[in-house]
Regions:
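AMP-binding adenylation
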Residues: 1-26, 30-33, 212-215, 292-294, ...
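Nucleotide 5′-phosphate-binding alpha/beta core
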Residues: 1-97, 103-128, 132, 192-194, ...
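Active-site phosphate/ATP/adenylate-binding loop shared across adenylate-forming ligases
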Residues: 2-10, 69-251, 255, 263, ...
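Short, well-ordered beta-strand segments
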Residues: 136-140, 305, 399
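Short glycine-biased active-site loop of nucleotidyltransferases that positions the nucleotide triphosphate
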Residues: 147, 275, 389-390
């Protein structure tokens, strides 16, 4: 069994990277040995590979990559089942679901051991990002049909930081119990509890801040927005800061949390900075070529892969998260921490789409639209010119909602879209709720491709 952390649990974050890697090598050997004994998927996948010959993270290239599709196809096969482990390493604490391309979300199993590890990781995240035990966190994530990581993890992060937490319970109603609450209740929750940290999906946080201005709510206690759950642009984050300034908030810090159900959260030590791995003894990251599994040098962009070094529930080795990033292992110039950092921009591997024969990046158009403060809401749509005809030409459209000068704004949007995509774009004026209704949707869909 690997040794426990040093007396100072954060010491590893400032150690020379060679020391970090030695700890990772030790944890990896133990993790692989457990997988060889009781992990159905990897026992089959690694047939013919001498797992004992893999002595550290430098040898991981000899193991195949694991895709999201592999996990979605048979999530039970990724559960570690070693019956002679201590009870806390075997006992199921919780099941959290991650979204996928199928109708049903994919379960990720956490034992008591894993939950404690997440508390440990979350304490580090709080320290790096500046969340304090005196903070009051307003959980503005939606209450969803399946227990999703964002909502569930808000309270865990509060526990880890020693902070107070309250929840607004927004989201689309489902089932027989009337427990979901409207947008105005979210505003009231922040005001009544004098919340200092707003925790949620950025598109919904923006709606809360705009509604707070309309209601003249007291948000002077707010000092930070901690956002995750959907991709954001620098322009969107600046829009959140603008709203905070308009409300005379105590602070305008916007931390963009990066992570997933499978890997937990990374943390920024400063706004718009890189994302620190807060627990290098728990997980290892590499950037790879997804076609051949080859590890790419630090600084080169490729697909992010995570390897669990110390888990007991769902265990993933060389798991492709789905994001294109780069890594650096140089000491952080701002805080001096030495664990690896994810360097943006973070681009989903599936973000490039072909429209009328042109390969475009919808994210670039979304970023440009987010920088237009006159837009209350917007959505980029790729569809067929004739919905009933699957062979008709592609059409790129932008649906917008605004309150003033719609004709002029529509012309500006069309010109900006053409400049970015080189594809002529149709602009449609609609009601804001047709694009994003906080009472029915968990987050805004800024880009949709509805072609059949």
């Amino acid at each position: 069994m690997p040794s426990s952390s040093a007396a100072d649990p954060t010491e590893i974050l400032t150690a020379p990277y060679s020391e970090i890697e030695r700890t990772q090598d030790e944890r990896l050997r133990h993790m692989l040995a457990l997988c060889a004994r009781g992990h159905d998927y990897y026992e089959r996948k690694w047939a013919g590979i001498d797992i004992g010959s893999i002595r550290g993270v430098a040898d991981l290239e000899r193991l195949p990559l694991t895709s999201k599709q592999d996990l979605m196809a048979d999530p039970e096969a990724f559960r570690l089942r070693v019956p002679d482990l201590p009870l806390h390493e075997r006992a199921l604490w919780e099941v959290i679901y991650t979204t996928g391309s199928t109708a049903d979300p994919t379960p990720v199993y956490n034992t008591t051991y894993d939950y404690h590890a997440y508390l440990f990781q979350s304490r580090r995240v709080a320290e790096i990002s500046g969340i304090r035990e005196t903070d009051v966190i307003a959980n503005l994530f939606p209450l969803t049909p399946a227990p999703m990581g964002a909502f569930q993890r808000s309270v865990t992060n509060a526990y880890a930081a020693g902070a107070t937490i309250c929840a607004a319970l927004p989201g689309s109603a489902h089932g027989n119990f009337d427990v979901h609450r409207p947008l105005d209740y979210a505003v009231r929750t922040v005001e009544v509890h004098s919340a200092s940290v707003l925790w949620g999906v950025p598109s919904f946080l923006r709606r809360v801040l705009l509604r707070a201005q309309e209601l003249k709510a007291d948000f002077t206690s707010v000092r930070m927005c901690a956002i995750s759950g959907e991709a954001t642009t620098p322009e969107m984050r600046e829009e959140l800061r603008r709203c905070l300034r308009a409300l005379k908030a105590a602070g305008t810090t916007v931390f963009n949390r990066y992570g997933s159900t499978e890997l937990g959260a990374f943390a920024q030590c400063r706004e718009e900075g890189d994302w620190h791995n807060p627990a290098p003894e728990i997980q290892y990251h590499e950037v790879v070529d997804p076609e051949n599994g080859r590890r790419l040098p630090d600084g080169e962009r490729g697909m992010l892969a995570v390897t669990h070094l110390d888990r007991r529930g769902t265990v993933l080795i060389r798991f492709l998260v789905g994001d294109v990033v780069s890594l650096t292992r140089a000491p952080c110039p701002h805080c001096g921490r030495t664990s690896e950092r994810v360097v943006g921009p973070v681009v989903r591997g599936s973000d490039l789409v072909k429209v009328k024969g042109m390969l475009i990046n919808p994210g670039a158009l979304v970023a440009a639209l987010a920088a237009m403060p006159a837009l209350d809401e917007f959505q980029v749509v790729v569809r067929r010119e004739k919905e009933s005809d699957p062979y008709s030409m592609d059409e790129l459209a932008v649906r917008i909602a605004c309150r003033e000068a719609p004709e002029k704004l529509m012309q500006e949007v069309a010109a900006r879209a053409l400049e970015i995509t080189r594809v002529r774009t149709k602009v449609e004026l609609v009601e804001a709720k047709e694009i994003y209704d906080p009472g029915r949707q968990t987050k805004a869909k800024r880009f949709v491709d509805v072609r059949k």
